[in-house]
């Protein structure tokens, strides 16, 4: 094995694990490692990633611009730095708008549709007043939409919802899901290119990270007039 493209879900607290990964390149038989999605450059691991803080901020700011003032969050596990960064972006957008960051507006899932559904049910049962929902991934957002439908909470007229990732499911959901686009095909392509450069010794000296630009994809969970086109590519 000459190289590994790693998409790790290990806790950010597992510092020893990340240091051991970084040490592979210094071993007798060098094994180069590229991290996908997570920025592990502080450990000396080349990372191809997006700015999750910015993504969380863009998502929240957009909901605010659409008239939402009580935005609930469906987060992934607390131990993941990707989710932490998205939550920090959410908080920053609220504070920029002069709004209070309220932890009672946050529920946690495990990235699955079921966990998003159950998290949304908890928010509803707790009597939390909300007019927007930021889900830290698309799969949980689908669960959010199901829970809202069961409780006759109309989307988007009463509550607007935004996800994160722009996976295929976001374009086929009903209503279709507004989300933050993470160009996963581009990310994988760059990771393979950079790993090849590392193996061949052509990677520029000092280069340790590559950030992929993200963007907002507007669909009908925030604007009923948006096209509900199914995306047949890049999924």
Model segments located where?
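Periplasmic-binding protein-like
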Residues: 1-11, 32, 72-74, 106, ...
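Alpha-helical recognition/docking segments in bacterial nutrient-uptake
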Residues: 1-61, 125, 235
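Helix N-cap/beta->alpha junction signal
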Residues: 8, 52, 83, 137-138
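Short beta-strand/turn micro-motifs composed of small residues
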Residues: 8, 37, 49, 75, ...
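An alpha-beta-alpha
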Residues: 57-99, 104, 204-222
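Flexible loop/turn connectors
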Residues: 48-51, 121-235
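Alpha-helix capping/helix-boundary segments
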Residues: 11, 40, 79, 86, ...
